[in-house]
Amino acid sequence: KWNTKIIKQDELLGRNGRVIDSILSEHACEGMLEGYLLTGRHGFIHSYEAFVRIIDSMVSQHAKWIKMAKEIPWRKELSSLNILLTSHCWQQDHNGFTHQDPGFINHLLPKKSDTIRIYLPFDTNTLISTFDHISRTKNYINLVVASKHMRPQWLTMEEAIKHCTKGVDELSWASTTNGKTPDVVLACAGDTPTLEVLAAVSILKEKKPELKIKVINVVDLMKLESNDKHPHGLTDKEYDKLFTTNKPILFAFHGYPNVIHELTYNRT
């Protein structure tokens, strides 16, 4: 986007933003986006989940830059660095093993809690709601992991906005508790894990109709963290009310299992 005067001799200059496409270098795309954000504008980088690991160190340095910039009084807030990952580890029918690495979540998790946000929308409307939110934020690194293929649509737009605002909630229409104490909690985070949990509930309703199942979906991963450690985190009281204190919890998670352990090991 060219913001100053365009003269007759100029070529390939325009006043509208453009999509920079088909540059097979995450380094180049990440660097261009960071520079673009420094001009006060907005943007996002889209990459395969497995290959975003190429810019691990660049994102780490941007997180450090955000921290230091916030300490300088005359620095204005910058639009967030938004990272959208598709072609994720659960949809690799043609590429397979080489394209399966959800570890970028692990890479971001230890960063400063006032900088990092991680989202796992599970249908089109939750993705739209999530993207609408992150595009308005400042001074964050927002990670969104989502499918680029046709997927079931579970929520209306109104329901999706409500669910994403909470970040984590029971999918009451999928639960089989009928308002009673559950026998088991099935939790999920990510589009494919959510599909698998809902399929499991469907099977269990047929095979074990007496089983009371509570289904919980997590869009904002940092909700699982304690509110003492992350501003998005649930309080212990909120967590216990949602997940129960004495029922088995089966968690279907998009990434590596140690992420859930790290976020919840101090919970009830």
Each language-model region and where it sits:
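Thiamine diphosphate
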Residues: 1-268, ...
